[in-house]
Structures are given as C-alpha cells and as structure tokens.
Amino acid sequence: YPENIGMVFWSGANMRSHGQCIAEFLYLMGIRPKYQSGSLRINGLEVIPLMELKRPRIDVTARISGLFRDTMPSVMQVMDKAVLLAAEQDEPEDLNFVRKHIQEDTKELEQQEGMEHDAAWRQAAFRVFGDAQGTYGAGVAALLESKNWETIDDIADVYVRWGGHAYGGKTKGKFLPQQFRKRMGSLDITIKNEDNHETNMLSSDDYNAYHGGMIAAVRSIKGSAPRSYCGDSTDR
C-alpha cells in the first residue's frame, strides 16, 4: 500500500457528487462519518477498526481550491478532525501511516525548531492546504503563460508558495510552506477526480495548474515522479 497520497479538491465537483473526494479522503484514513438519526447530517466521526478495514490507514494530503475553502469551511474541519482521530489510534506504524508520519514530524519539529510537543503535533498534523484567505489559483498557470520559469524546480516553488497555507481547527490559512513542501516530497500517488463530461483536462489550465503542479512539486522535491490518477465517476 502507498503511505502517502495527495488529492486535489475542487468545490463544484464535490457539490455535484455529494462529496466523493471527501468520502475518499476519510476512507483512505479508515474514518467514517456518524450521521444524526433520521437525517444525513454528520454529527461526528468514528474509526473503522483495522480488522474491518483490512489494510493500513493511508496518509492523505489535500490541496484545496480557493472556492472549496470559501464554500466548505465545515468540511475542512471534518477532514482535519479525521486526521487527528486517525493519528490518535494506538496502532502499529505499519498499519497506521497517519500516526507514523505525524509522530516523525512532531519529533523533528521539537528537535530542530524547539517547539513544545502540543504545538509541534498540531503543526505536523495539518493535511488540508490551500491558498491564502481571499486568493485563488495554484500559481502555475500564470507562471507558464508568462514563460517566467526555467526548470521544474521553479514550478514546484510557486506551487508550494501558493498552496502552503494550512487549514484546520482554529488555523485558517497559516503560511507553512516548509510543512507543505515536506508533504509534497513524501507523496507516492496523486489524485484528481472528475465527476462529469462537461469539462475535462483540455478545457481549462486549472487541471494542469492544480494536479500538474502537484506532480511537478513531487518530481522536484522527491526526485521521482509519483503515480498519478484521474478518477472517473461520470457514470455514478
């Protein structure tokens, strides 16, 4: 199983599909929503036992769009809580990659940055990243159009700078480029889901900017290309 997956989250696709990317994010981590009786309102989260899951909990990093940030703030909180819940489980490292990586990064922040444990854990656990408040885009499209780049490292730097704002809990867009860069450099797989035939990756440069930018960042930082997938749920 891959230890780290990066996903691109757009608002419109999740509205139309009733949250397919959100559900995928939760399930990869082995977390499921608890629904209020008699409705589809989520009133909590619960852990899927490893015996039922039959695989490790996979670490997922979300790169959200500016519109996703604006339209789904409560969903971002659910996603953040799911990460923390998965990380709290006292399970073997080879069966809980979320906990494994957060523990490793927490220790690194304590030793190298001198951070207190709770603050280091909180920073290490951010998995929802996007633009700064009030801004939109991945930065890559403008960079390519202006021809103001020379190597893939330039594209990666712009992608990290634009997307390196963390969301979760009381944090609303804290600029943590090194944390986001570390997440990008760890990815084994990248995913961008498509839910209809109205648009496709040849219709807009946003596909290249968000997903292509993520792939470029992984190639630059990690030194090798991730496996990259475009999920197709148009026949749902």
Residue ranges and their predicted role:
Residues Y1-R236:
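Ligand/cofactor-recognition surfaces for anionic moieties
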